[in-house]
């Protein structure tokens, strides 16, 4: 077990100060310099303002040009429940609301970094510079690395809802589901934004019928709340706006990292695009389900969440790169679990290809497809420019990410992995006095160990 001194070394304090400075300077840049800083948060806030016509804002919630900024005409794309959740911001000054979003984003990044730190510690791996930074300093430095990666950088810029979605999903899986069944927080996340419902696949693989029922009931409750409190807007969303893909944006934009997005970036369209998407989507669900089962046998909850997050952005028709806020957790899972436990059983050539794809995905998505596409000074939207280097190359990291996870899933089919000894989760060795350390650490032990042993007993008696 790797241990660090309780006192934070000077370099760790410098890392903490650097993180605080980055957050403060980032906030000032967004409100004072960047004309589009907090753009998405402004849309959330205006959506909430329509409920009581705050500040004289009287537009319909699902009007096509809900917010107009220059040539941009942006709609409100979320369920009515999301507008209700953001209602408190309608009564706060815009700058105060942005400050809360920035602090919330930084807090979510810190928590994710804490989980990744605990993940590495439980795996017996030390993070770079951990010895000279100390525990808190290492988490601060890791938070900086997380917030500078493509998805989080763009999320910070737009003040997006994705860190909240991530926090709800992660919390539901790493908390002790003793009094409140698992699935409640995922259902709430689905009420804010539909795509998190795909995390129900983990519950399905676990045969957690209570969790699935709880998820479904919670999600339906969010819909009911929308119909009760917003009786005019709810039918507009559920019977009209939800089926209009043009409201989300241009599906061919280089920042679309979904399967459908990178297929278009590589030149497919029309029937070939549809057939390719449906085939790869079906393959993805099947292989990820197999991988989730093998991860379940080993109690690898964090890897399950990371893999399913990748499936979520792959299946959605449009997934902007900033939707992929679980990317840091997936990269950690690849390093700590995928390659040392699973990929090692692949043939040498396949293992090298998977490693190369993982590097391309990690580096490319850390930079972000938008930046890569912009470097070439070429058009990033029009269909006629599909084979322009900026679009094709910008789309390759998202393909590489998907392909890496598929390699991982195929590796989980190998006989040595399938026949490996089932062992309980090892997060219990993480220090219990860590900030929020029981989330993703000690609280998982008894529940997850019991689940693993139960599954092992079923297999032995089958």
Predicted segments with their positions:
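Primarily membrane-embedded glycan-assembly and transfer machineries that use lipid-linked glycans
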Residues: 1-181, 206-324, 337-339, 385-389, ...
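Aromatic-enriched
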Residues: 335-339, 343-445, 451, 455-462
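Active/binding-pocket-proximal capping segment
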Residues: 328-333
């Amino acid at each position: 077990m790797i241990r660090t001194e309780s006192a934070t070394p000077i370099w760790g304090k410098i890392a903490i100060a650097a993180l605080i400075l980055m957050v403060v300077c980032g906030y000032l840049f967004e409100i004072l310099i960047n004309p589009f800083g907090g753009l998405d948060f402004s849309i959330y806030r205006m959506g909430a303002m329509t409920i009581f016509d705050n500040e004289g804002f009287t537009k319909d919630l699902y009007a096509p040009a809900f917010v107009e900024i220059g040539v941009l005409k942006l709609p409100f794309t979320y369920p009515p429940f999301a507008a209700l959740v953001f209602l408190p911001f309608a009564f706060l000054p815009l700058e105060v609301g942005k400050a809360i979003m920035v602090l919330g984003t930084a807090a979510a990044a810190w928590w994710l970094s804490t989980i990744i730190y605990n993940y590495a510690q439980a795996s017996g791996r030390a993070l770079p510079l951990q010895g000279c930074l100390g525990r808190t300093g290492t988490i601060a430095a890791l938070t900086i690395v997380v917030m500078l990666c493509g998805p989080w950088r763009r999320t910070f810029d737009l003040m997006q809802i994705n860190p909240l979605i991530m926090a709800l999903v992660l919390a539901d899986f790493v908390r002790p589901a003793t009094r409140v069944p698992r699935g409640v927080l995922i259902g709430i996340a689905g009420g804010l934004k539909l795509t998190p419902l795909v995390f129900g696949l983990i519950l399905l693989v676990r045969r957690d019928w209570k969790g699935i029922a709880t998820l479904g009931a919670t999600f339906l409750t969010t819909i009911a709340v929308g119909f009760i409190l917003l009786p005019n807007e709810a039918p507009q969303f559920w019977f009209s706006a939800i089926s209009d893909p043009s409201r989300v944006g241009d599906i061919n934009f280089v920042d679309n990292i979904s399967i459908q997005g990178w297929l278009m970036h590589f030149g497919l369209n029309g029937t070939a695009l549809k057939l390719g998407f449906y085939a790869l989507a079906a393959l993805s669900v099947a292989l990820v389900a197999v991988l989730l089962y093998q991860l379940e046998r080993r109690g690898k909850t964090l890897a399950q969440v990371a893999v399913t997050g990748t499936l979520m952005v792959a299946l959605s028709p449009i997934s902007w790169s900033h939707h992929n806020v679980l990317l840091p957790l997936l990269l950690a899972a690849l390093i700590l679990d995928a390659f040392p436990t699973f990929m090692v059983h692949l043939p040498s050539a396949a293992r090298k290809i998977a490693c190369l794809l993982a590097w391309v995905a990690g580096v490319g998505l850390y930079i972000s497809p938008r930046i890569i596409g912009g470097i070439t000074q070429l058009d990033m939207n029009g269909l006629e420019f599909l084979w322009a280097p900026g679009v094709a190359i910008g789309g390759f990291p998202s393909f590489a990410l998907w392909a890496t996870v598929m390699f991982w899933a195929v590796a989980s089919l190998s006989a040595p992995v399938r026949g490996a000894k089932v062992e309980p989760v090892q997060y219990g060795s993480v220090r219990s006095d860590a900030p929020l350390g029981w989330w993703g650490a000690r609280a998982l032990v008894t529940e997850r160990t019991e689940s693993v042993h139960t599954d092992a007993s079923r297999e032995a008696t089958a």
